[in-house]
């Protein structure tokens, strides 16, 4: 009885490092699981290479447009020296907005479509397969064969409901990402060369940090809702509500867990962008390949995080109820 109590307490103390370590153990302990996740990641890899090429070309075009030197109001002379003040050559955001031509807008729409339809659907399929199989491997001592994984990777009856939850997650994720983009673009287009540059830089940095923190904290909760849909059969708004309940008091762990995977993905993307990866196919392949290798680990970690948050909450509830019983008995 005492050993069971100690075991329960140990489970309650899973921190970010413990979750990551346990996810690595689950992932690499079964070679068939590695092979299966690799095979299911191939379609995601292909479409993501295509998406990254478009995205990085778009980032280069955006950077070139935003950072173009300003033109004189009187003639076509271009001035790149901003050390003097002359109202004839003042900063005009409307000129930057005019540079976003039709081709740029079409490329932006196409990139958004690729992200929200084929890429997200393939990420969803990869996620639910990884979550379902990782949960089985987590709860069973027996290893699964590759044949067993192929025959029934997940419960098909939960597919539709899980997809509904993923649509909610997509909407919430996209709106917060657009919020971050809105802050950055406002700073570069309207505020960067204003008289109160330093003040606006501090305000925008603080706003960006706040929204990013919210995004990472809530990403853990949104990912938890998808895990709950796949494993528990709770969908949509109900899944989000349940995940909010179970993640209460665990936001710090969720924040750091999501920060690790967020930093990994963006570090790869920015590294590839700075070396001109969109012009050299090999760099894009390496970037996407490394991302797809770590992506299953993210969902295994989310599955463990959900189990741990649930155990903590249920244990706390049981302790509160037993405390009430003792108080009433006395």
Q: Model features per residue range: what roles?
A:
Residues 29, 100, 104, 108, ...:
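Membrane-helix interfacial "entry" motifs
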Residues 112-206, 213-227:
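Eukaryotic endomembrane system proteins
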Residues 25-39, 158-163, 248-256:
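Membrane-interface helix starts
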């Amino acid at each position: 009885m005492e050993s069971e109590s100690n075991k329960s307490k140990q489970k309650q103390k899973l921190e970010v490092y413990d979750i990551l370590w346990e996810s690595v153990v689950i992932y690499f302990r079964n070679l068939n699981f590695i092979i299966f996740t690799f095979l299911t990641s191939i379609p995601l890899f292909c479409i993501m290479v295509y998406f990254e090429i478009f995205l990085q070309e778009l980032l280069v075009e955006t950077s070139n447009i935003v950072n173009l030197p300003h033109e004189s109001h009187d003639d076509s002379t271009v001035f790149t020296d901003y050390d003097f003040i002359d109202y004839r050559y003042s900063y005009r955001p409307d000129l930057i907005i005019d540079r976003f031509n039709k081709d740029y807008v079409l490329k932006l729409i196409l990139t958004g479509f690729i992200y929200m339809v084929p890429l997200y659907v393939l990420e969803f399929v990869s996620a639910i397969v990884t979550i379902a199989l990782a949960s089985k491997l987590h709860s069973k001592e027996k290893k699964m064969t590759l044949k067993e994984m192929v025959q029934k990777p997940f419960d098909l009856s939960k597919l539709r409901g899980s997809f509904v939850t993923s649509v909610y997650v997509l909407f919430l994720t996209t709106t917060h990402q657009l919020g971050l983009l809105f802050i950055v673009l406002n700073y570069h287009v309207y505020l960067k060369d204003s008289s109160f540059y330093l003040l606006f830089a501090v305000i925008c940095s603080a706003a960006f940090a706040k929204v990013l923190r919210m995004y990472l904290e809530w990403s853990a909760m949104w990912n938890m809702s998808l895990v709950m849909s796949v494993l528990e059969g709770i969908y949509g708004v109900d899944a989000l509500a349940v995940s909010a309940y179970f993640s209460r008091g665990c936001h710090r762990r969720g924040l750091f867990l999501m920060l690790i995977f967020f930093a990994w993905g963006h570090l790869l993307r920015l590294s590839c962008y700075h070396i001109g990866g969109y012009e050299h196919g090999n760099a894009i392949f390496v970037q996407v390949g490394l991302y797809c290798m770590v992506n299953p680990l993210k969902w295994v970690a989310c599955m463990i995080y959900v189990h741990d948050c649930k155990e903590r909450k249920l244990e706390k509830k049981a302790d509160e109820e037993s405390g009430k019983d003792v108080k009433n008995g006395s």
